[in-house]
Amino acid sequence: MSADSVNSGSAVREPDPYRVSRRSLRVRWRLLPWWVKVTLVYLAARVLTTIMVIEVARQQGPNSWTGAKPGYLDFASLWDARWYEIIGIGGYPRELPLADDGHVAENAWAFLPLYPGATEAATLLGLPWKLAAVIVAVTAGYGAALVLHRLMLRFLEPDRALFAVVLFSIAPVSPIMQFGYAESLGFLWVALALLLLVDRRYGWLVPVVLAWAFTRPGALAFALTLGLHFVWRWWHRDRDPFPPREQLVVIGVGLFTVLAGFAWPLIVWGVTGQVDGYTETELAWRSAYIGRQELVPLTPWFQGGAWWATWVGLPAWVGIAAVGVLAVGFAAMLFLPAVRRLGVDIRFWLASYGLYLFAVFFPQSSTFRILAPLFPIVGALAVPRARWYRWSIVLLLIALQYWWLAGVWRVDDYDWTPP
């Protein structure tokens, strides 16, 4: 048999250059360090969000803060961003302002000082306030994405952990991480605290909790998380040793977290002389909905359910029943297999923060943003690997992000519903 016949009988397929190129890109991507991947994901998400922000800003009409079609920095400095600017420049009032009805009016004491302080420090470099506020927010969000990836790697494979970062970076309220808000700094502390808790590096929680308590509310919810963590470890101490020294450390950190959680209301009291100054300040924001009412724990969601149902023309009991269904659904969600993969500590946090909100928060237009510290749930959403699922959820979150920008963040005439 000739060589030609052998060659013709076993023809070799020429390599497809496009296929090789695709494989090369995949290989190069897989070989990148984890932090480079997270950086590229976060940057791509922020670029996408910036495009949407600019588009929505073009639709913005004149309002009490800006003219029509404001630039990016002006559009990113609406709503509560102005309160942070007021705090950064002028500090807090020594006397609580009063509304026409004699109750405490909306004022700067509702906002914690670390974010405006960090932004004011950045202005010492010569940056204008609005630019500094965005830079601090974007940088903190990037840090949160990096820490979240490390946290997810404790429970998920690398591709799933990275996809969790993708979902975090494009979530419906993720634009807040490039606006003049403290949320992204709060996300950083939440992610760091959970990572330290999972790794049982309890002592390092002290500075993180302290920073958290002066950035965003939620430290008291984390105190409950620490309590649940202690009970869990003590109950399982036979198979997972829980030495007395560690028990004392967890108790000490838990008590410190409780103190940190109450520190700001105590400071408001000390400066203004009004014992319930912080609580009354927070109640001012919900008075636009239900008028001035006392805070009774575990009732705000039912009040809100009744109000929203009546607002859309339904009986109040429909809204109250809906709240009950939501509460049961949230509790059941914690036991789904995908959520259980995240470990007990993350589930303790989800339960603690959910209970914290259920106890004191009145559901209003800012509900989506207030729910954002539940972001570790993206780990459960990242578990399925099917391409159709991943593309679908990415497109859904991007669509919801645009809806949040256009329907919640954009100011519409006389808009009393801050995002």
Feature locations, PLM:
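Membrane-lumen/periplasm interface segments of specific transmembrane helices
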Residues: A45-P62, A223-H236, D240-F330, D345-L350
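Transmembrane-helix motifs of polytopic, lipid-linked glycan transferases
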Residues: E120-A121, I135-F155, V328-F335
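Loop-to-helix entry region of an early transmembrane alpha helix in multi-pass inner-membrane enzymes
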Residues: G102-W109, P113, G117, L125-G143, ...
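Multi-pass, polyprenyl lipid-linked donor-dependent membrane glycosyltransferases
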Residues: V136-A140, F155-D159, F163-L197, W204, ...
